[in-house]
Amino acid sequence: MTVLIHVLGSDIPHHNHTVLRFFNDTLAATSEHAREFMVAGEDNGFTESCPALSLRFYGSKKALAQAVIAKAKANRRQRFFFHGQFNTSLWLALLSGGIKPAQFYWHIWGADLYEVSHGLKFRLFYPLRRIAQGRVGGVFATRGDLSYFARQHPGVRGELLYFPTRMDPSLNSMAKERQRAGKLTILVGNSGDRSNEHITALRAVYQQFGDTVNVVVPMGYPANNQAYIDEVRQVGLALFSAENLQILSEKMEFDAYLALLRQCDLGYFIFARQQGIGTLCLLIQADIPCVLNRDNPFWQDMAEQHLPVLFTTDDLNEQVVREAQRQLASVDKSGITFFSPNYLQPWHNALRIAAGEAE
């Protein structure tokens, strides 16, 4: 039997760390198909912190792609599970036959599915990537992303799967210590990445609430982002008074980030695609409602779990926010499909499907 190989095809340290730790701590002990990884980027201590995994690192996305293609050609029974897919060479290999459809199983992370970049090289590449995506052996994704993907590629098998957000189920029923009263605190975006459209979001928040709310913007990740942080701060200070605007430019440890989220009353995410599911989960767990773009298909996942959804096009005010908080507080969090530990069984199923052991 050929063991499934997992591929992290782009050097995205935060996401790669989450995936590797999840496999090491949760999946590797029960499945031989959860132990082999090919990773773009440096080791950064992963080998030491994930002893249950066999990890091979590659200095560039191209080097990793070449290694994957060589393995795929050497053994056509070898199957790969691609987690996210931000590697042009791998898509082209699927198009050219270097990797066969039956070898290629893909967990959609959101950004790798949608065509939102306006750069010329992206606009030229998107049609090719779209054709390649129709040739994969199967996809795993959120409910909303499965729906989006199926409209373009109805013949490709799709299975529900959620990114393994680090969550403590014991916090599901823990009431917030502070009383929900007074000035609202609004979280804008889930990172410092430009895909959060911070400037557009800040203007939208100001249009809805004016300078009457506290605005928190976490921008400590990714690194080397100071010019964009300064740009966001300049626009933010033109809209909000200094005491109402908090732009966080330093990377935060998980516990500190969790504490920050629990001080908020509302999450505001203006981007028109599925992303930031980890932050959304942690907010929902703390009875903090989220405002989504209506074009972000994750609202379908939330509605399926009977969670209140607010949209950027809604008329928002404190009364609306407090009512959404009340509705969230009445939901039994232990039954939410995309919460830990409920997302575990779909992962076991995904491993068997990608490995060819399940129909």
Swiss-Prot record:
<dbReference type="Pfam" id="PF07429">
    <property type="entry name" value="Glyco_transf_56"/>
</dbReference>
<dbReference type="GO" id="GO:0005886">
    <property type="term" value="C:plasma membrane"/>
</dbReference>
<keyword id="KW-0808">Transferase</keyword>
<comment type="pathway">
    <text>Bacterial outer membrane biogenesis; enterobacterial common antigen biosynthesis.</text>
</comment>
<dbReference type="GO" id="GO:0102031">
    <property type="term" value="F:4-acetamido-4,6-dideoxy-D-galactose transferase activity"/>
</dbReference>
<keyword id="KW-0472">Membrane</keyword>
<comment type="similarity">
    <text>Belongs to the glycosyltransferase 56 family.</text>
</comment>
<dbReference type="InterPro" id="IPR009993">
    <property type="entry name" value="WecF"/>
</dbReference>
<keyword id="KW-1003">Cell membrane</keyword>
<dbReference type="GO" id="GO:0008417">
    <property type="term" value="F:fucosyltransferase activity"/>
</dbReference>
<protein>
    <recommendedName>
        <fullName>TDP-N-acetylfucosamine:lipid II N-acetylfucosaminyltransferase</fullName>
        <ecNumber>2.4.1.325</ecNumber>
    </recommendedName>
</protein>
<comment type="function">
    <text>Catalyzes the synthesis of Und-PP-GlcNAc-ManNAcA-Fuc4NAc (Lipid III), the third lipid-linked intermediate involved in ECA synthesis.</text>
</comment>
<keyword id="KW-0997">Cell inner membrane</keyword>
<keyword id="KW-0328">Glycosyltransferase</keyword>
<dbReference type="GO" id="GO:0036065">
    <property type="term" value="P:fucosylation"/>
</dbReference>
<dbReference type="GO" id="GO:0009246">
    <property type="term" value="P:enterobacterial common antigen biosynthetic process"/>
</dbReference>
